[in-house]
Amino acid sequence: MKFSKQLSAQADLRYLNEYISYKDLKKAIKVITGSDVQVCTVQDVVSNFRQTNALTGSIFRPPESRFQELLNHELDKINSFSKREVEAILDQLAVALVIMWRLHAALTLLRLAPDSPGYAEAQALLKRLEQREQEIRNALVVYPQKRGRATEQDKAGSPSSNPRCRGVSDEPSSSSEERELGAEGDDFSSAGGKTSSRGEGDAKRRQGDEDGGEGEQDDAKRSVAEALILLEKDVLEVEGVLEAQSQEIVFLDSFVRLNFTGFRKITKKYDKHNQSSAASWYMSRVVRQDFMNLNFTLLLTRLARCYVALRSLRRRLGEQQQQSLSISPADDPSKAASVKEDRSTVGSFSQSLGPEGARLSTYKRTGGSDEGEQRREPRFSLAARSRGSRDCREDIKVTKYLIAPDELMKVKVLILKHLPLLAAGGIPMDDSVLCPFENSSQAVAAEDFSAALEAAASLLRTSGTASDKREARQSLGGSRVPTWEVYLDNEEFTYYTNTRTRRDSPDSCRGVAPSRRVVRVRWQGLPSLNSAGRQVALELSRPDSSIADPQEDITTPLASNAPDVASSAFTVILRQKQLLQLLHGLITPSKLLDQLMDEMEASAAGVATGEGANATAASHRTGARGAANRGEGSGGGGGNRGSDDRAVALTKQKRKADMLQVLQTVWDAVQQRGVSPSVRTWFYRTEFMSEDGVAWISVDEDIRFSREMNRTPPANQWIRSETEALSTDDVHPFPWGLLDVSFLVRDNGVALPQHAVQQAKDFHPLVGRDDLEDFVADLRGLSTLTEVPGFSLFAHGTAYFYTPRLQALQARMSGYEQAVHLIPLWLQYTTNAEFDDDASQVFDEATEGGKGKKADRTSVGQSRLGRNQGDSAERGQRAGSPGGLSRPRVCHRGSVIDVVHQGTSASLVHDLQASAQVSPPTSSGVDQLGNSHRPSVSESRHPSAPALSVLASAPSLPMPAPPLLEVSPFQSGARGLLTQPLLDDGDRMAGERQSASRGGAPTPSQSWLLTGARYWRRYCNCFSLSGSAGRRRRSMSCLFPWSQRSSARRIHPVGPRSMVAGGVTSGPSVRVEPKTFFANERTLLQWMNTAVLIATISITLMNFGNPVGRIAGLLMSPVAVFFIGYSFWVYLRRARALERKEPIAYNDKLGPSILVVTLMLSLSAVIALNLLYHEGEAQLPITPQNSSTSTAPSLPPSPHALPLLSQLNVSHSQAAYKAPSAPNATVNAGGYSVADVPAPDFSLSHPATAYAAATALAAAEAAAAAGPVSFAGAPERAVHAHVTEAMTHAASAETAAAEGARVTAGAK
């Protein structure tokens, strides 16, 4: 699909004029560059861009300047609309939050009795709150002009008829402005007016009920119920507004992506028409624009705050409804117990927010199972179990999905509606987001309703003023904090192999360092030049762990190793300087532990001595709450001081033992197994967790991988610097988002703690009504999600960068029963970096043909899922079969410097940069750096000791292709097609040479000694083959292996079981377009044109040239003959390969090289011959011919010569007649010379003699006259004619003299 159609299909019709004017820009480009002036006129373009100066004016301006002005016009339009939209969303969310605060105060007022002392004061306070709400709403109301220009369709049609118009009221109004205002402002005014009048009416009804006596209590309850119904309607209206703003945030993200793609497409089109390369410069300016740096983190934070308040308000409303509809215990004693139970159940939320600010401890993954604190913290967390079972996941279901980048915002907003937001973009949320009604709820729990209303009033006083304006100013340039992870492994990939070969077992969680754990270093923060003092976490982690694991929590600060702060027993917090000493063997684990314990003691005592202060006050408060929840702190009332001190001492000793064991394990791995940094990854994480700790969800975006093995970092660092510019060979941008869904299950036979089951039933509405499973099912049903079982960042990064080594290791392990597949199944579906719409268009043309072009795809999910699932499923079956490994792919466009973009739209920029990297590492035994990892014969027969140890303890783990991957978007999308290579093992030698040219280490095939020895062994083995059948064929394949590789290039359909472990798979057939055959013919004609031109020049030189020209023609004519034959051979070879769909090397490097070298040699030879001949110039005299051998014809007698004879008075006695000599008697022109012509004696006694003498005299005079003539500057042909004439006259003179002598002799 072309981008113009995609833009019109995906654009929001309300703001269609605010998008990039792609079609108008295409027309303007043709007018500016002059490529097609018939499309439109200058007046049309000017009118489209509203009188811009880009195309007008009498002063000459280059096309670049005019195009830049058009881009600036579009950028200004998009930037202004984006900022207005962000401010409008923030204003609407602020008004919604104010409304919910007022409704919360109104619910508090309903709990007061009319005869209570503070009822009148509370009622007056509520009126002031309503007035304050009205002032804030008037100040933050958003008019239609602020939200952008309305289209003609919006002005003419009804809002309800347009399904794409979001947030517009269905009530009819007189104008579009009133409709817009009703959608954005009147939704709140109705809530305010109803509540105000309802408050006064409720007070009057209550006062009437008090005067009327006890008989009218039913009417009072009925009035309270009616008031609650009206409040519920207000809550529904607020929920509708939040839903509309959620869709606005999703629309804004799509708006940014579409416009960025439009600018990228239009700049490329300008380069195409203008024959320039300015697209990169234009896009560098686009990246710095305001619309590319919108603070989506702030929008998500404000939206999450509103949804948390909405859920709290709903719980308070349900609590009040149950209290109003309940029967008094005095009237019906039988129901007193049930009423009491219901009140305790519905009041659990406010109780959980009450004492000692326990809100943060419930979100922290460190909690306790103390029975005395069950009522204070009804929410159950994963950390409530014991430490040994906390790190196991028998009762937690983990599912990981891959998300397309353009659907990340939609998924995050969907999750945010159901679960609280813990962290957005790596930034933890504060108390105002996680619990906006904390102070008010605490007062309600203490039955201090006046204090609750005063807390709500204080919140209103701080709203809509400086804080909101400050947040509005922060709508641009929102910062995010990346999470960095570095995994350590050795050259034998021991830890990676363990993770791929070992299964989960009940005993895997026993002990400090289970077999499946790997050494990992984790930290958070922006890249820094000086990071030696940064705090990092040295961990023994599971690579495939879920977000429920405490080690994956990014909200816990890496501040201290204190027991009340540490999130896991497998984590040690230390500085990077100390980590460098440990990895280099400069410090022992025991000594490092002593330093860490001293720092922990100093931090606990509040001694801030430079680097020794590792814990802040906030972390201590958080740790104190965690320790209180676990029962590790104070004894919970009644315990003596001595028992508390002993418990703290035991906890510290246990923590010290855990730290020592972790440090010792890392030390042994470094010293004995030689582990070093292998793979580094960084990403931006967004975390969600339910209030009771039943569900955890995380979304990782902008994931990038970096190679660290075989790299030499500086001496003062343990990895390469974070700010170092990395080439595309070392950085892999992962073009997908990662969704981790983890939640407790109840049907797997694992019994949860009793208090957790009771809290799940009493408190959490999702678990109680099975809505959590429904919500997860809705997530799974999204077309943009694809489940990938067993996915982990460590496995993907290692398999991507070190594919050849892993395949070589797998080949050595293939002979063992316990061998497994070391290459993950998802690798070939997720390693494509060409994430571009052009790729989708190519795939449409290649797979769907005519049907795909006619399909109407208005949805990104449909366009991604509806592409040729049959062929993709077949590819998935082939890839999912045992031993299905990727084929060699050594194709890179270059080593482009990669700059990490830190903006909010980093994924878009990274997708643009990802086009520099085409494919993952090869499987041909040569990695991207040219390092050979193909095992030798001895290695394949005798594996190393670590490999044997792995195989000895590795159970069999078959990995069939999962059904979900067979129909996943990665097989049916263009990215799966583009990852298929074009070359196979037949071009491995070329790949090795290409890899070596990038600076890699020399491979065995590059060493001529090893190459000669290998061919000699093959030659000797050829004659030792047993059997008579096929002996000749086997001998030829041994002696000439390239013939076998050439025949192996042909691809035939293979079944899913046709591949063996460790072998090389045959790729899919390449579909050839008809235009490819025409291109092959055009190439032949171009070669023939050049060859015919060379042949014409050489033939001309040989026929009409001088001796030097003839030599040059002889040199160039074989060149022309060779290229005529060579071009025809190349044409036949390519045509045959295209017909058979053979993936041969279509890039011809031999022919052009020979052509250039031959032409250079020919021209050099011609120039050399001319220079050498003129320097050694010599005269070539022409000797006179004898009379007997002369071939010149005799001159017949002529009567005109008789008068001349009378003038000659020459006696017969004269010796001879010679032509007059002169200095220029010798004529030299074109290599010819004429000498003096001797004249024999003759007499005049006979007429014939006289005629011969006259003829000889005329010839001699002609030769003498031609002698002194200068031929300098004359054409060569004219010079040649003159010389020929002179020689003819000389020959005639000689003939005449001989004839005269003969006549004289006859006369005598």
Curated annotation (Swiss-Prot):
Vacuolar topology ranges: 1105-1110, 1174-1308
One GO CC term on file: vacuolar membrane
Basic and acidic residues bias (residue ranges): 197-209, 332-344, 848-857
Originating organism: Toxoplasma gondii (strain ATCC 50611 / Me49)
Protein name: Vacuolar transporter chaperone complex subunit 2
Underlying gene: vtc2
Keywords: Membrane, Transmembrane, Transmembrane helix, Vacuole
Signal peptide location: none
Site (Important for inositol polyphosphate binding): 22, 26
Membrane topology of the entry: Multi-pass membrane protein
Consequences of knocking out this gene: The VTC2 locus is refractory to knockout, and may be essential. Partial disruption of the gene results in reduced polyP accumulation.
Record-linked InterPro entries: DUF202, SPX_dom, VTC_Complex_Subunit, VTC_domain, VTC_sf
Ranges of residues in domain SPX: 1-284
Keyword Transmembrane helix annotated: yes
PROSITE patterns assigned to the protein according to its UniProt record, in alphabetical order: SPX
Main location: membrane
Cytoplasmic side: 1-1083, 1132-1152
UniProt KW Transmembrane helix keyword: yes
Oligomer status and interactors: The VTC core complex is an integral membrane heterooligomer composed of at least the catalytic subunit vtc4 and the accessory subunits vtc1 and vtc2. vtc1 is a small membrane protein without hydrophilic domain. Vtc2 and vtc4 are related and have 2 hydrophilic domains that face the cytosol, an N-terminal SPX domain and the central core domain. The central core in vtc4 is the catalytic domain.
